Amino acid sequence: MENYPFDTTGLNTDTIDRFNKTYQALREEFKIEPTGHIDFDLHQFKAFRNCLDVNVRGSFVIKKDCGDSYILFVEVHFKIGEKHITHHQEFQVWGLTYLKNNFGGVVIRRETLTDKILELIHPHELDFDEDKPFSNTFYVVVNDHTKASSCMNRDFRNAVMDIRDNDFLIEIVDHTLIIGNYDPIIAEKSIHIAEFVERLAGAC
């Protein structure tokens, strides 16, 4: 029986293959190694707030001189429906890194037409007048405008702009940043996630 660097208990063959292909693709691009057990406290993030359970199936560190970043293989359980409730299970890949500065609470995602309309009625989005391309592309909600606007400098915004994927969510709680999406596991998307967190971790 093959040994995998992640927990395969109860996983079907397709999920194991997807995780393994992603791991192998990451190994080709980055110097990664398993972390062993670390509690990343994912329940603090709104991205997982509606989940009944969040289980890290595998965690891997990308080593840099200036700081480490992480790739997480995550299993989530949540409920769908109100009257007729069904339990749903998904497997996802998320990136995580620790930031030097305290950003407060921040959520960043691609801006939709609905966001633009709502912003006209109830303005609460953080915009950067000096960086219209960023503000026109991303929807940014924060709980502390002073912290977020000072920490989200040009280098940070450029890193977000350079992500080679359209469907992602970034969330920051104080010094901890995660990035991921709710799509099925795809190795190429995981590479884009890893590129972003490695870039932030390497910003001395």
What do the PLM-derived regions correspond to, one by one?
Residues 2-204:
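Charged, low-complexity intrinsically disordered regions
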